[in-house]
Amino acid sequence: KKKYAAVEADIQALNTKADALRKELEALVQADADAFAPLAAAYGLPKDTPEQAAHKAAVLEKALDAACAVPLEVMEKCAEGIALVEEYAAKGSVMAVSDAGCAAALCKAALQAASLNVFINTKLMADRERAAALDAKTDKLLDEFVSRADAVFASVTNKLRNK
């Protein structure tokens, strides 16, 4: 429509970014499963002798740290998604604004879900300094992007419910 001609190039660029982001998130699903396998294996290691216990602890610590990497990346990608959704909600068609609200809610849910996967691993880490750093990064993403997703959702709800 003529009404959206001024932002058509912006929307096309957003579509390209969103498609690339979707593909990255899909790949992270498998990466998350792949990262869990070594952690599961570490839990199964024997700890009957002091040497075995020390080996298990070291392997487990490394696996816990690695198991945080993918959920943190998922969180970063969800944050990118929320930023894209802000633009869609501001520039997109009124007929598609509900899609922006849905995307904001889903990105927020995925962001929060991924944070739980970080927290369950950091809780079990022996290196409390490393765990605190990972928790701080997770908290920062939650603090910024949950509120931004909520703002998009509220804005879209307002547009849909009020004339």
Kindly label every feature range from the protein language model.
Residues 1-163:
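Conserved, well-structured ligand/cofactor-binding cores
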